[in-house]
């Protein structure tokens, strides 16, 4: 028996990307493994971003000097109107920002809005950002007119948008032209639908949604954890928007930091060993990556495919293999989750039920020997079958007394 040294961001001819998948039944040590990974990357000086669905990561995050924010409004707000750095091109960032807000709006309208209403919504957004001074009056966005990375208080809030909608509707003047007048009436009705939606959001969910982003210099925070325990209990139309916005903020961080590292490395200003990486952790991912939150699954798929370019990786964790691998009986949404998990280079498989063995054999033919497969149901706490590239290793993870105290709540 020897020691096991693991770095998520080691690249070889077989290990080409930095995504990982952790399976482990309750009590198998799945969350402990994730916390060990967080500790390691923090010691390396890398960035860590966590989605915490159970509220158990706070002691570790704070011990490592990180920031912990509950997204239910207790600790502050993530402003969905803040434009994230989701691409190296500012114009593309705007397009993706409108796409994000449109997706969230559609979710809040529970898919009851037609394409014409969505078109009106995107037009109102552009006019609003121009009136607010974020977008130039001609609507043209260039690298010389940055719209990303501004101080959080520079961006509008949900109540600002509601004020703009009220004013826009009150000041509307119908056209004397009959044809255009009819179009104007349709526009007015659609704009009023948008206004009504945001009025409800500000009145009933303002403490969660309406305000500037609470954490300043968020991209400079090494370890950041969003607690979504209470958020997951909200109605899906509200919950999905908050989760989607949180994912976009994490993606913003990866692109922003990764682009800087890429430029420094390609200009030979830093060596490969000096690159700062970003790791996103999603524990109990079955709470978010499911048919109820399809837009979140799509966004995570984009991130999983693109993060390698930005020296970043995602670690998904869930309990049973059968939670996500449904085989031929999977729905379209379930297949999307399966496709997402297929993007993982590393797999850590902890204790599973015996019924999972046929699923493993079918999903990963030839990947595991018969002996390895039949070891999985009898793995003890802290033991995992680790696959990295073309290697399988059975590894036992241990914790110190200090870690035992910090990891309390999920082991």
Show where each model-derived region lies.
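P-loop NTPase motor domains
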Residues: 3, 10, 53-71, 79-312, ...
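Short, solvent-exposed amphipathic alpha-helical segments in soluble enzyme
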Residues: 242-245, 364-365, 402
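Glycine-rich phosphate-binding loop of nucleotide-binding enzymes
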Residues: 1-72
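Conserved ATP-driven motor cores of ASCE-family P-loop NTPases powering translocation/secretion/packaging/pilus
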Residues: 74-77, 81-111, 292-398
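Short, surface-exposed polybasic-aromatic patches that bind anionic ligands, especially phosphate groups
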Residues: 397-408
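Short, glycine-/Ser/Thr-/acidic-enriched flexible segments
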Residues: 1-2, 9-11, 27-28, 55, ...
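Structural motif
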Residues: 40, 272, 336-339
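Generic enzyme active-site microenvironment
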Residues: 50, 281, 317
């Amino acid at each position: 028996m020897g020691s096991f040294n693991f770095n998520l961001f080691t690249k070889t001819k077989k290990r080409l990307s930095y995504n990982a998948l952790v399976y482990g039944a309750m009590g198998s040590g799945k969350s402990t493994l994730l916390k060990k990974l967080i500790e390691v990357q923090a010691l390396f000086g890398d960035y860590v971003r966590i989605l915490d669905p159970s509220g158990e990561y706070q002691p570790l995050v704070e011990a490592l000097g990180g920031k912990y924010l509950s997204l239910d409004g207790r600790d502050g707000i993530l402003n969905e109107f803040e434009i994230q750095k989701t691409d190296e091109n500012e114009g593309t960032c705007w397009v993706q920002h409108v796409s994000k807000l449109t997706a969230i709006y559609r979710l809040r309208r529970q898919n009851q809005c037609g394409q014409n209403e969505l078109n009106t919504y995107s037009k109102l957004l552009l006019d609003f950002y121009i009136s607010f001074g974020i977008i130039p009056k001609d609507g043209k966005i260039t690298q010389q007119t940055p719209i990303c990375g501004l101080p959080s208080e520079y961006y509008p809030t949900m109540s600002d948008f509601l004020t703009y909608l009220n004013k826009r509707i009150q000041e509307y003047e119908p056209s004397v032209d009959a044809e255009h007048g009819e179009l104007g009436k349709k526009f007015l009705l659609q704009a009023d639908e948008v206004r009504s939606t945001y009025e409800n959001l500000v009145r009933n969910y303002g403490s969660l949604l309406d305000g500037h982003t609470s954490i300043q210099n968020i991209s400079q925070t090494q370890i950041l954890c969003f607690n979504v325990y209470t958020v997951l209990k909200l109605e899906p139309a509200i919950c999905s928007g908050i989760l989607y916005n949180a994912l976009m903020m994490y993606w913003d961080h990866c692109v922003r930091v990764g682009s800087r590292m890429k430029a420094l490395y390609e200009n030979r200003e830093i060596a490969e060993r000096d690159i700062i990486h970003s790791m996103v952790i999603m524990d109990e991912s079955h709470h978010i990556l499911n048919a109820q939150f399809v837009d979140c699954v799509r966004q995570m798929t984009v991130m999983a495919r693109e993060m390698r370019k930005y020296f970043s990786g995602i670690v998904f964790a869930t309990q049973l293999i059968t939670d996500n691998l449904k085989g031929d009986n999977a729905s379209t949404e379930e297949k999307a989750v399966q496709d997402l998990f297929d993007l993982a280079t590393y797999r850590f498989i902890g204790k599973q039920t015996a019924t999972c063995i046929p699923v493993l054999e079918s999903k990963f033919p030839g990947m595991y020997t018969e002996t390895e497969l039949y070891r999985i149901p009898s793995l003890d706490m802290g033991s995992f079958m680790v696959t990295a590239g073309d290697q399988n290793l059975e590894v036992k993870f241990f914790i110190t007394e200090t870690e035992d105290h910090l990891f309390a709540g999920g082991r």
